[in-house]
């Protein structure tokens, strides 16, 4: 990864004065979370995996036998459940906590993947999660990835990236992720899951997956993670330095 300018460099934006929001949207298994985590670490920003939050809601509903059509019970559940993140000091990852318990491994299972798009499309769920996400990032200095960050959660984000990749590449990546956790799934089943989720996410009435008009398209089909991270960091650097450059020019510098 290419390093950003150091704080010793003249003109480095004062971290206490200037913070931005980096919104990374796109399809599942394009490398959003891995890229977003690395970018956040490089900038010293908070990282929020909004997809994990919807997976947490899905897990809660399944474990409490709440039908996805039972809207009154879902609204009650949203008031009862507590979703937060806890940093794992050994791995450096932010892990999802549901009612105070780390549930990171459970929310990544295929049974959750098969239902999360349906749950995340429910208006009550969407509204509750968007409110919480906006509260988490209201001080800025955050990298957030999901489906509607640049269009709904933070439409004023200074950096917007929309990630995509071909379905076969995405399926291979997801299969590798699951295999690491000893969950062996046929590639055809993963492709079917991705295609169904793409359709649901893109056609739902509430905050559909779409590229914001001012988002930069990033096809990660043939890119390494380092290349993806550098791509985002370059745009973050431009956003951070643009106001400073403008101020310098106005002052005759």
Positions of PLM-derived features:
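Walker A/P-loop
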Residues: 33
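ATP-dependent NMP and nucleoside kinases share a basic, alpha-helical "lid"
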Residues: 104-181
